[in-house]
Amino acid sequence: MRTTFMANEANIERKWLVVDAEGQRLGRLASEVASILRGKHKATYTPHADTGDNVIIINADKIELTGNKINDKMYYRHSNHPGGLKERNAYEMRTKYPEQMLEIAVKGMLPKGPLGRKMGKKLHVYRGAEHNHQAQKPEVYELRG
């Protein structure tokens, strides 16, 4: 007789959580959000199943970086054409694309593969304090740090 609980799609209850990024450090916020997306904050966590909650991050443009990372940290992408390497520093990313900056940080902390991509789809990042998920009745989540 098996007594260990194994979560599957039929018995998972997902909540919607709102996290305010204002004044938070990028890495600390990203690691906690990645843990929520994986479902590690629940007693029903199962490594091979997607048990995590949906997370809405607001005020992404007010995220903080310590030290001189705002000028030194670089984000790279490539067009797959010769000489197609593009780079931006963290200051440009925070002013122009703060949503991408947070998505890159969080998704880099999720598992690689199909399950990790499925978990990443439950992340919703917004630049300001407004989001369009009021119908899901999200709860405010206070970060531990």
From Swiss-Prot:
Superkingdom of origin organism: Bacteria
CDD domains with a match to the protein in the record: Ribosomal_L13
Entry's Gene Ontology cellular component terms: cytosolic large ribosomal subunit
GO MF term (any one): mRNA binding
Pfam family, one: Ribosomal_L13
Gene Ontology process terms (BP): negative regulation of translation; translation
Keyword annotations of the record: Ribonucleoprotein, Ribosomal protein
Cited function: This protein is one of the early assembly proteins of the 50S ribosomal subunit, although it is not seen to bind rRNA by itself. It is important during the early stages of 50S assembly.
Subunit structure: Part of the 50S ribosomal subunit.
Homology family: Belongs to the universal ribosomal protein uL13 family.
Protein's recorded name: Large ribosomal subunit protein uL13
Organism this protein belongs to: Oceanobacillus iheyensis (strain DSM 14371 / CIP 107618 / JCM 11309 / KCTC 3954 / HTE831)
